[in-house]
Amino acid sequence: DMVMESDRSEFVIVYGRRRVGKTFLVDQYYQGSYDFTFVGGHNLSRQRQLTSFGKALKKFSGSKPDKFSDWFDAFDALEEYLELLDADRKKVVFIDEMPWIDTQKSDFVSALENFWNGWAARRSDIVFIASGSATSWMVDNLIENQGGLHARITSSIYVRPFTLHEVEEYLQRKHCKWDRYQILQCYMVMGGIPFYLSLIDPRQSLVQNVDRLFFSHGGIMRGEFDELYNALFSNAELYISVVKALAQHHDGMTRTEISKVIGANGGTLTRVLTNLERCDFISRSQNFGCKTKDTIYRLMDFYTL
């Protein structure tokens, strides 16, 4: 409510791991009442993203879609459309899966900076919501941006998975009759991810649900592991090799030990470990008095485990 009632334009980011309910959260609050919304496509070229953006703009504006040559053109068209709307209310723009839009050499972030700094921030009637599952991209390009978007975010929401208590409440709302031991086992399998929990059939036992979702032919969760990591990270194989190594060492591993197992070091390994930590797949801890190189990394994502 504060965002909608403020006397300035608002730049809001909603981020967190895949399947955690970011889009659902925004949709529930606004009840689909957007003045413009667009969802980035996974592994699409810049031109295909721009074409999809134009079609989305046509849907809201009713005008013939332009063929945009770059993201500067696309945001210019968005500005022109928003300027035609009622000036006495907040206009809500929701861009979902933003990291997927920023393809190589796409100029998307530069165009976004220009849109916000050159137009939206100078007004008082825009609510611009950016959401994405690639947490590292959201942090690097928005929260900790050192360029034109530095300190421009007015609100941020990090959506975390359900706690064990919240999982119990959710299953009770689904009229699930499981005892607490089964609920605990479910939490250890699903990791508190709302989408995964939504797939549970309360008429079946936990074992029956796991068999149906994970192991049966055509099970919805059967290919989720690879899909999850490929959707979040480029060079997903390297990330998977790290989490597989950590899964074999419940007491954790040092950076040196991880490096020996996966054959990567230097900046590459630093980036992988940082990105996994930002997405809450791993945690790190350091014993008192130990050096940084002795930091212990542990796998903490229940679903991955």
What are these model-predicted stretches?
Residues 12-15, 19, 100-104, 108, ...:
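Sensor-1/coupling segment of RecA-like P-loop NTPase cores
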Residues 1-7:
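Pre-Walker A adenine-sensing motif
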Residues 7-12, 34:
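Pre-Walker A (Motif I) flank of P-loop NTPase domains
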Residues 195-196, 200-305:
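Accessory nucleic acid-recognition modules appended to NTPase machines
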